[in-house]
């Protein structure tokens, strides 16, 4: 019986997008683990999850020692690792973010006070290149854990849902996500009444969201996001049922595990009698450091009063003190609608925003919200400096790289400084996802962009502060963002009073409110829509009306922050003289060899003569980067002389033919394959300076017009001006004089 293999599956119906089958299997692989499960997505993506517990508890710890590891195997995608040793090394960013996605809903589902080490190891064994494995891994982790005989209130179901062509699609593929307006991972569990309690959400808009909305798609507003959470619930229910079906056949009975409660009731009661009034008073101090100093003083008084009666129970006194603090903070918010620092529930702390915070860098900004202070720094470079990714994902390069640093001094402490921890990687990824939807395309802005967020001071949501600082820093660097993005952290506190649950949403939470609340969520977005959202809750479900009201409250705060940021900077600045100038030129593919020359002789000579840096793409696009614009132009002229000998230059005149008219001007063909724009403001000159309402009243398709090239932009687009004969005669007369 022990070696018998058991199966269960969930079939997800996506209507016109087809079905997805998630199959769970146990009893065939990793039989010595306490619990093991294999999750398949459509039989060609396979994730093995093994959950193991230590035999003895670590009773000296004051936290639950759960670790989650995701092992990406390159063989899963038919690859050999690209490293020197041709072996998998440190986990990729995708793997680390998946670890966090698994940890967040699973950790609060274990019995409180558990101190046995629990390790969940996920191995990605096979991957369809069009699939995303992260949600499969969350389900696999939950399944192996409920089979392991641990005190765990699972199962937990997780799905990715994306809004594609007006429909919420579960487990979308990479191909389908190209048309998605919004994409989110949702995890939850089924309650006794059959409803689904949402536990964790990680959501974002996509690179194409703005264009799709322009083309008529529905913008991902707060209402749409709430609808997406509801759409995910039936899928989560089906996944939980499949895991429960498997557990009913193969789960081990729940073992006896010692529970180490933080404190006994007698300690809490004695502490409450001893210091409640002093603690209440301390919690009214607005400043973080002053408040914490007073809280430490009250804690010492509590220890002095209680230790004679509770000798050797110092840890319990400390834990009870924290619990009493939490209780008092929550009571004050629920009853008086007043928070730790004296603010009302919707008040935002004092905001400050400035750009050009440090010299010489390509772009910088400083954003402050109360005691949270973030420095954003932008660096621009050639596209060949973008990050190369050797992962299981089909995405092989990343043009926008967002790094987040959280030094220990930001909270007035000492600690390790060095390579980023999982938390820093997670915060950087959240800020990155918030900004990506508003970035210009590679064609519009051919630069690799590195954004660094330095958390110089922390007291509540440095990740959302990073979004604000990054937006301003990018604009300061001259990056033409499609819209400004701001972020805010929200909290939710609930309490049952007279048999009815009361909810209070808090805007701009402090670090302490984050720890003491029932839910925290971070929302970033533009004035029009949400670009990123992260939600974690300890509640067994949030009423839809409460969530909708909290999201609206977050939107009001975001709009206020955007106004403050706009006062500091609202349009892209001129690029820094220290930033490289990058222009593009297109050449015929059959001319690439001539530009490179034998053994690279020609391209090396151009680079040496002009000081420019040249990158050639396979499609004939050439990126020219240089410290000065004149160097880049010199390289462009040399390349055009080789590959585009008929390429027009500024100041040259042509008798062109109008090939197309639009509301903003006329496109004029100068030579085969080379058109320029004669803007409506220039067409006025052909109408004697009169206002032109309709371009075709002056220039129709097929009309001949004498034009001069006024400007060639960084993408090679031509701007034209008309040549007026009378004006030319006047210029000649002036010259003769």
Swiss-Prot record:
Mg(2+) binds at residues 514, 520. Its main location: cytoplasm. GO terms for cellular component: cytosol. Involved in mRNA degradation. Catalyzes the phosphorolysis of single-stranded polyribonucleotides processively in the 3'- to 5'-direction. The lineage of its organism: Bacteria, Bacillati, Actinomycetota, Actinomycetes, Kitasatosporales. Its cofactor is Mg(2+). Belongs to the polyribonucleotide nucleotidyltransferase family. GO terms for molecular function: 3'-5'-RNA exonuclease activity; magnesium ion binding; polyribonucleotide nucleotidyltransferase activity; RNA binding. The keyword RNA-binding applies. This is Polyribonucleotide nucleotidyltransferase.
């Amino acid at each position: 019986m022990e070696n018998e293999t058991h199966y269960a599956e969930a079939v997800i119906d996506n209507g016109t997008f087809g079905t997805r089958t998630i199959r769970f299997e146990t009893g065939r692989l990793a039989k010595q683990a306490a619990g093991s499960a294999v999750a398949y997505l459509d039989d060609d993506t396979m994730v093995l999850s093994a959950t193991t517990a230590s035999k003895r508890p670590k009773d000296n710890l004051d936290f639950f020692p759960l670790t989650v590891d995701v092992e990406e195997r390159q063989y899963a995608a038919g690859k050999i690792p690209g490293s020197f040793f041709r072996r998998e090394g440190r986990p990729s960013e995708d793997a680390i973010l998946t670890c966090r996605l698994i940890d967040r809903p699973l950790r609060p589902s274990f019995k409180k006070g558990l101190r046995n080490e629990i390790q969940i190891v996920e191995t990605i064994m096979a991957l369809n290149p069009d699939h995303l494995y992260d949600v499969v891994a969350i389900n696999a982790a939950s399944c192996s854990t409920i089979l392991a005989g641990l005190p765990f209130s699972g199962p937990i179901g997780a799905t990715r849902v994306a809004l594609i062509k007006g429909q919420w699609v579960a487990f979308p593929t990479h191909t389908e996500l190209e048309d998605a307006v919004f994409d989110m991972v949702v995890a939850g569990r089924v309650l006794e009444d059959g409803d689904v309690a949402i536990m964790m959400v990680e959501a974002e808009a996509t690179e194409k969201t703005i264009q799709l909305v322009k083309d008529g798609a529905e913008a991902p507003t707060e209402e749409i996001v709430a609808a997406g959470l509801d759409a995910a619930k039936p899928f989560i229910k089906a996944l939980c049922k499949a895991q429960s079906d498997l557990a009913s056949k193969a789960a081990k009975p729940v073992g006896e595990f010692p529970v180490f409660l933080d404190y006994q009731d007698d300690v809490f009661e004695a502490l409450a009698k001893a210091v409640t009034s002093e603690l209440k008073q301390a919690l009214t101090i607005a400043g973080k450091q002053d408040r914490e100093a007073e809280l430490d003083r009250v804690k010492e008084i509590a220890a002095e009063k209680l230790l004679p009666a509770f000798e050797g129970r110092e840890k319990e006194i400390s834990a009870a003190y924290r619990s009493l603090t939490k209780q008092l903070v929550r009571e004050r918010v629920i009853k008086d609608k007043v928070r730790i620092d004296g603010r009302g529930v919707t008040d935002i702390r004092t905001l400050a925003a400035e750009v050009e915070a440090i010299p010489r860098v390509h772009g910088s900004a400083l954003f402050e919200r109360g005691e949270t202070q973030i420095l954003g720094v932008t660096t621009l470079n050639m596209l060949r400096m973008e990050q190369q990714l050797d992962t299981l994902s089909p995405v092989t390069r990343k043009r926008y790289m967002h790094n987040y640093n959280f030094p220990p001094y930001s909270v007035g402490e000492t600690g390790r400084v060095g390579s980023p921890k999982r938390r820093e990687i997670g915060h950087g990824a959240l800020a990155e996802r918030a900004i990506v939807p508003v970035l210009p395309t590679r064609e519009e802005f051919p630069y690799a962009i590195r954004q660094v967020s330095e958390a110089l001071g922390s007291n509540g949501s440095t990740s959302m502060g990073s979004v604000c600082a990054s937006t301003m820093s990018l604009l300061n660097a001259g990056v033409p963002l499609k819209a400004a993005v701001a972020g805010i952290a929200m909290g939710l506190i609930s309490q049952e009073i007279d048999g009815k649950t009361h909810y209070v949403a808090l805007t701009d939470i402090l670090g302490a409110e984050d720890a003491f609340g029932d839910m925290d969520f971070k929302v970033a977005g533009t004035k029009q829509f949400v670009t990123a959202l992260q939600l974690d809750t300890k509640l067994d479900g949030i009423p839809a009306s409460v969530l909708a009201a909290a999201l609206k409250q977050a939107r009001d705060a975001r709009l206020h922050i955007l106004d403050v940021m706009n006062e500091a900077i609202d349009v892209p600045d001129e690029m820094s003289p220290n930033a490289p100038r990058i222009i593009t030129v297109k050449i015929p593919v059959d001319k690439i060899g001539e530009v490179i020359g034998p053994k690279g002789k020609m391209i090396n000579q151009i680079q040496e003569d002009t000081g420019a840096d040249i990158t050639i793409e396979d499609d004939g696009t050439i990126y020219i980067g240089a410290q000065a614009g004149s160097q880049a132009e010199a390289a462009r002229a040399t390349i055009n002389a080789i590959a585009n000998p008929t390429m027009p230059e500024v100041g040259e005149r042509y008798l062109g033919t109008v090939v197309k008219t639009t509301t903003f001007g006329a496109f004029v063909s100068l030579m085969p394959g080379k058109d320029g724009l004669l803007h409506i403001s220039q067409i006025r000159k052909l109408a004697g300076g009169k206002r032109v309402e309709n371009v075709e009243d002056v220039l129709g398709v097929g009309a001949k017009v004498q034009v001069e090239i006024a400007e060639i932009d960084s993408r090679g687009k031509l701007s034209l001006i008309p040549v007026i004969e009378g004006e030319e005669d006047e210029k000649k007369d002036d010259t003769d004089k």
